[in-house]
């Protein structure tokens, strides 16, 4: 958005210099993209008088001029300089414009230096308008009236000394699309006083011959308010010079007084208006939704075909305007126009944005309406524009006609001065906070603050804090050191869950896994394969059909990654991921999971034959390593109760009582086929948050106690039912004497037809190694036999096992 400094000062009473205003605008959130200051470009060019002009002694087309200049202004003494000039109108007594040595001439891009032209010294330059980039006239040097004040800056005499400021307005600040909105922010900052904007209703002298109606369905969403009035007897000639100059300065082409006035209000007060030629309207105006197929020749000379639902302004005969976007050519005003209908309406931002985007029309009106103009200024803007038309174009106004009502945008939020410190960290006195909000147009009543109608972006208490901090300047926010603990060790920065997550990630990396980061969204079919896919985790507005549900497990994403790698020739891989999984949409139904996936072989090919397919024991070992890293206790139970996506008989679950900690095993072949993964593939999943925290926290780790006495190992072979799990035997043997037994491990299993032939149908043999570690004395044979008897007794009681003969 562009505006001039004088335009800003129409609304802001200030003595602040331009640089301070520009800096303040950027600091307030309105980024200044550029400043065109004529003073910096043309400030050195001053009015002068040619005392004498004689022919150049060495050139027929050049003139040798003695010029009286006032380099220090009209009140300072004059200086005489010699200038060689080639303009045909250079003559004695001419009043022109002089550029001294050292001046940059914008029209030529040259910095003036003392020179010698055809053997004669020349100091400075007599300028044409093209050399000053004021016009394309280069027939001669500037020729001013005799009464032009000597020594005055030419830009002041010409009236082209008004700086132009271009500001980038963010989409959330539609009030900044008017000069008055920017002036209000600057006044709140303290750079001046916002001038009042009195609105005096213009009395209606006759009923308006043009009526207005809004289609009932559009009053709720589309056009809540449409107002206007007829002004008859106007003279639609060129607008005044000051208005034309102001519009040109912001890049708008003056057209006629009526059109220029509407553009003036659009830029100055953020109030888009439109004028219809009454003579070209049949009956009244109707705001309605297009049925589809209607065509309108717009003011840009293009014909637009409307779709069903897009808003139109039509008379009794045909469409006349694209509502809130652009007027129609057929009802446009010309120099012959004498009676006009002035429109001021409030249009729904979403509807205007959708129509403008569909028709690919960009206009100043659309740009403002789709961001949200002030609905409460609809009628005051109509009155102010009416007064200006009467002043510049004459005529008389009718009574105001309208349909609809001003939308109720009133709302209030709690105003707590302490929130500025807690949210922003700035200490601003309460009185200053209240003054700031009131200067911005907020209404304060007790602990409530009501935003003005022109601020649709303010939607909560945090926005009040933002306004206060913005006006006070966030550049004043100073860094403060973090508070130090008064005594003792400071609290850890990371939570226990974050510490465990880091430990799991480091352990997986040490085990050789490559970490993946997959989407939290998967398709419904994949979600159902892993126990998900319910409506509770369906994404309302998915990115694509492959991301419709929140993932119930990390395995689908890792399997998809494995399939993509296999398709590119990578058969062996170790992938892992740590992230959230979702069982439902309620609080507490989200968990942190650490998952590893092994596919293919355990090692590269080598001459020693160590390469083998990955198996369930690889997954189990890695799962135990990660569990140990996150603090899981050594004694955990392993069961076969695993979900259906694991291979039955080649998988297991790790838990503490009813608390599930992890699952591991081969991925079910059906799942591999569905996910397009070529096996073998084993995996494990760990629910990190389910691992219990230590009950007792010690300041330091206790010293490791090692016995000086020699350990003793004894082997036991038990005959058990084929259904008995090895872990049951291990746990039973471990519990025989917890003080002496250091470890129990399975070292052999004998099963199958040969085993049953020796031991009976449905039987197998499991062999255990039990390590006994004394701490106070060396074990005797009697001690060892006693412990062995306990082990046999415990195992027999737990499993019905007998010692193998």
Curated annotation (Swiss-Prot):
Binds 2 magnesium ions per tetramer. Residues 39-155 form the tRNA-binding domain. Tetramer of two alpha and two beta subunits. Its EC number is 6.1.1.20. GO terms for cellular component: phenylalanine-tRNA ligase complex. Residues 408-479 form the B5 domain. NCBIfam families: pheT_bact. This is Phenylalanine--tRNA ligase beta subunit. Mg(2+) binds at residues 457, 463, 466-467. It catalyses: tRNA(Phe) + L-phenylalanine + ATP = L-phenylalanyl-tRNA(Phe) + AMP + diphosphate + H(+). The gene is pheT. InterPro entries: aa-tRNA-synth_II/BPL/LPL, B3/B4_tRNA-bd, DNA-bd_dom_put_sf, Fdx_antiC-bd, Fdx_antiC-bd_sf, NA-bd_OB-fold, Phe-tRNA-ligase_IIc_bsu, Phe-tRNA-ligase_IIc_bsu_bact.
């Amino acid at each position: 958005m562009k505006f001039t400094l004088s335009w800003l000062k129409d609304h802001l009473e200030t003595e602040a210099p331009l640089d301070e205003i520009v800096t303040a605008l950027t600091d307030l959130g309105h980024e200044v993209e550029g400043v065109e200051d004529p003073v910096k470009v043309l400030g050195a060019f001053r009015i002068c008088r040619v005392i004498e002009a004689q022919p150049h002694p060495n050139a027929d087309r050049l003139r040798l001029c003695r010029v009286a200049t006032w380099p220090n202004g009209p009140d300072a003494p004059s200086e005489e300089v010699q200038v060689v000039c080639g303009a045909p109108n250079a003559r004695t007594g001419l009043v022109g414009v002089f550029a001294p040595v050292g001046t940059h001439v914008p029209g030529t891009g040259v910095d003036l230096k003392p020179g010698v032209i055809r053997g004669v010294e020349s100091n400075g330059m007599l300028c044409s308008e093209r050399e000053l980039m004021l016009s394309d006239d280069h027939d001669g040097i500037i020729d001013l009236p005799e009464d032009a004040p000597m020594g005055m800056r030419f830009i002041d005499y010409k009236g082209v000394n008004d700086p132009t400021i271009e500001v980038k307005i963010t989409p959330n600040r539609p009030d900044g699309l008017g000069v008055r909105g920017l002036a209000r922010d600057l006044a709140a900052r303290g750079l001046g006083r916002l001038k009042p904007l009195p609105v005096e209703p213009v009395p209606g002298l006759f009923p308006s011959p043009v009526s207005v109606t809004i289609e009932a369905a559009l009053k709720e969403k589309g056009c809540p308010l449409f107002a206007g009035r007829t002004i008859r007897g106007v003279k639609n000639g060129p607008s005044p010079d000051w208005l034309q100059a102001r519009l040109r300065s912001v890049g708008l082409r003056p057209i006629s007084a009526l059109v220029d006035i509407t553009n003036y209000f659009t830029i100055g007060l953020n109030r888009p208006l439109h004028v219809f030629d009454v003579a070209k309207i049949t009956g009244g105006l109707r705001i309605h939704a297009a049925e589809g197929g209607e065509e309108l020749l717009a003011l840009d000379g293009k014909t637009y075909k409307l779709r069903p639902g897009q808003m139109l302004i039509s008379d009794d005969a045909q469409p006349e305007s694209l509502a809130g976007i652009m007027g129609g050519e057929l009802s446009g005003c010309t120099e012959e126009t004498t009676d006009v209908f002035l429109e001021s309406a409030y249009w729904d931002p979403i509807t205007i944005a959708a129509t403008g985007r569909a028709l690919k029309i960009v206009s100043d009106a659309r740009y403002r309406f789709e961001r949200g103009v002030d609905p409460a200024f609809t009628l005051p803007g109509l009155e102010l524009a009416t007064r200006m038309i009467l002043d510049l174009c004459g005529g008389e106004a009718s009574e105001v006609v309208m349909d609809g009502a001003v939308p109720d945008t009133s709302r209030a939020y709690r105003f707590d001065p302490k929130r500025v410190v807690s949210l922003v960290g700035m200490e601003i006195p309460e009185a200053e906070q209240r003054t700031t909000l009131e200067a911005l147009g907020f209404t304060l009543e007790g602990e409530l603050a009501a935003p003005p109608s022109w601020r649709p972006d303010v939607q909560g208490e945090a926005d009040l804090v933002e306004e206060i901090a913005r006006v006070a300047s966030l550049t004043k926010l100073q860094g403060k050191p973090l508070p130090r603990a008064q005594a003792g060790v400071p609290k850890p920065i990371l939570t226990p869950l974050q510490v465990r997550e880091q430990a799991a990630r480091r352990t997986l990396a040490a085990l050789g896994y490559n970490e993946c980061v997959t989407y939290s969204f998967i398709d419904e079919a994949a979600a159902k394969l892993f126990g998900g896919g319910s409506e509770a985790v369906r994404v309302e507005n998915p990115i694509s059909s492959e991301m419709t549900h929140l993932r119930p497990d990390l395995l689908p994403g890792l399997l998809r990654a494995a399939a993509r790698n296999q398709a590119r020739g990578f058969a062996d891989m170790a992938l892992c991921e740590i992230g959230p999984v979702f069982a439902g949409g309620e609080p507490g139904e989200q968990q942190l999971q650490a998952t590893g996936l092994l596919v293919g072989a355990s090692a590269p090919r080598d001459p020693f034959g160590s390469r083998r397919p990955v198996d369930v024991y690889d997954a189990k070992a890695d799962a135990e390593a990660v569990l140990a890293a996150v603090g899981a206790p050594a004694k955990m139970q392993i069961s076969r109760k695993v979900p259906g996506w694991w291979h039955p008989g080649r998988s297991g679950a790790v838990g503490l009582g009813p608390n599930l900690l992890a699952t591991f095993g081969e991925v079910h072949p059906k799942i591999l086929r569905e996910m397009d993964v070529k096996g073998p593939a084993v995996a494990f999943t760990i629910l990190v948050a389910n691992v219990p925290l230590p009950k007792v926290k010690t300041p330091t780790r206790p010293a490791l106690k090692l016995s000086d006495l020699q350990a003793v190992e004894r082997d036991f072979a038990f005959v058990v039912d084929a259904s008995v799990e090895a872990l049951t035997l291990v746990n039973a043997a471990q519990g025989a004497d917890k003080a002496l037994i250091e470890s129990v491990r399975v070292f052999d299993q004998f099963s199958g037809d040969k085993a049953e032939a020796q031991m009976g149908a449905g039987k197998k043999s499991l062999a255990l190694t039990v390590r006994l570690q004394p701490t106070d004395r060396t074990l005797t044979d009697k001690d060892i036999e006693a412990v062995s008897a306990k082990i046999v007794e415990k195992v027999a009681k737990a499993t019905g096992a007998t010692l193998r003969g």
